[in-house]
Amino acid sequence: MAHKKAGGSTRNGRDSEAKRLGVKMYGGQAIIPGNIIVRQRGTQFHAGYGVGMGKDHTLFAKVEGVIKFQVKGAFGRRYVSIVPKTEVSAA
């Protein structure tokens, strides 16, 4: 009768669930209030005009318009702003 000694158990074999972070709406896209623009950990992108920030650093639209991404300041901060619909239609 063939016998094999029992193998030891392992403490590996798990992985965390993906958090679905990233940019959800891109520059030039039309947006309405409440839409999520960026899901992030920390402030990779900063809130500009017409954009709010949630407690988990999620950026969301506060006004209707078109999204604009910009790099500003001495530290090269990335800002997300919204050009309001009234300005877009007037241009």
From Swiss-Prot:
Keyword tags: Ribonucleoprotein, Ribosomal protein
Signal sequence bounds: none
Stored InterPro entries: Ribosomal_bL27, Ribosomal_bL27_CS
GO (cellular component) term, any one: cytosolic large ribosomal subunit
Pfam families linked: Ribosomal_L27 (PF01016)
PANTHER family: LARGE RIBOSOMAL SUBUNIT PROTEIN BL27M (PTHR15893:SF0), RIBOSOMAL PROTEIN L27 (PTHR15893)
Protein name: Large ribosomal subunit protein bL27
Species of the source: Pseudomonas syringae pv. tomato (strain ATCC BAA-871 / DC3000)
Lineage of producing organism: Bacteria, Pseudomonadati, Pseudomonadota, Gammaproteobacteria, Pseudomonadales
Gene name in the database record: rpmA
